[in-house]
């Protein structure tokens, strides 16, 4: 880091789901290139085609090695399951949806229910995609 607390991208080795800076970011500055990459746009559209739109917590769990969290959650019968206004998406079971006014308690209940049922059925411990503080 510089004397002003700045860290350059070249000094950070980001990887898929890994940031060596185990901390929170309060500010970032990005340099953007002008233009449009149609290949990246198509890849993004394909990736999002099976994901729900609207208010979403996003992916709940990381995919376990050699499997998919969404497949496991669906296999235990929780795809589309709701508690209050929180719902495990009926489009992709690893997405948590806020139907209107979901509470933290309802969302957390669904996260723990999915983790418990998947472990009971498959012996797989699902790891959170996000950190709950």
Please provide the spans of the model-predicted regions.
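Phosphate/pyrophosphate- and phosphate-bearing ligand-binding catalytic cores of soluble enzymes
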Residues: 4-109, 113-116, 121-133
